Amino acid sequence: MGLGKTEWEDIQIKYGNMEAPPKQLTEDELFDLIKEAAEMATEAEKNEKLENASLKDLKDMEDDEDEDVLEQLRKKRIQQMKVEAELNKFGELKEISEPSYKSEVTECKGVMVVVHLFKNGIPQCQLVNQHLTILAKKFKATKFVKIRSEEAIHNYPDKNLPTILVYFNGDIVGQIITLRATGGDATTVNDIEWQLKQAHAIKSDLQEDPRITLARKKSQKSRYSKADSDESDNSDSDD
């Protein structure tokens, strides 16, 4: 039997004048295709289940799955859990006192520590506490603490508040002294986030200083407003 439905179609197909119609599957061939697709779907579902299985799930599968495969997945899952634990280690702005400064800050190893020296009654200190509370929840791999300035450093001048110190392995690796460089009372949480990123205290997605971004947007808005005004003036002149 030819590839076409008629002898004429067979000739045209032979000389490349037309394409052969798709082959009609027999009932057995169709059944085999459906069976193969079902087996592939089952295998994919099984692999996904193994990848997402908890340690308890993996233990429950011991009688049904290859032990070497389960052991590899178990090790992989434990490593994932360790990484997740490190990335979610903290998550809050914790107030500490002078006796605990050493253990909470200078003796803290392998972790970035952000320390806010503050004093009650200073509005900008309150502002920084608000911003750091937000950032602590966002960057849980970094330790955020606050301490009254008079407890951290005796006779520390109020004119230097708020002060943010960044520690790593007991050393100060970054600092923000007052909010003069970040806009004073207008300092935003993004401004603080950018400064902490510059000190490598956090892994932020910010690509540039928020003040530069804001200045550019204001400049663009000003240009658009001027262009609209000029266009309006020209329209009035035409009238």
UniProtKB/Swiss-Prot annotation:
It holds the Pfam family Phosducin. Residues 90-239 are annotated as: Thioredoxin fold. One of its GO terms (cellular component) is cytoplasm. InterPro entries: Phosducin-like_chap/apop_reg (IPR051498), Phosducin_thioredoxin-like_dom (IPR024253), Thioredoxin-like_sf (IPR036249). One of its GO terms (biological process) is protein folding. CDD domains: Phd_like_VIAF. Keywords: Coiled coil. Residues 42-59 have a biased composition (Basic and acidic residues). Residues 36-196 form the Phosducin domain. Residues 26-87 form a coiled coil. Signal peptide: none annotated. Residues 230-239 have a biased composition (Acidic residues). Residues 214-224 have a biased composition (Basic residues). Residues 42-64, 212-239 are annotated as: Disordered. Belongs to the phosducin family. This is Phosducin-like protein 2.
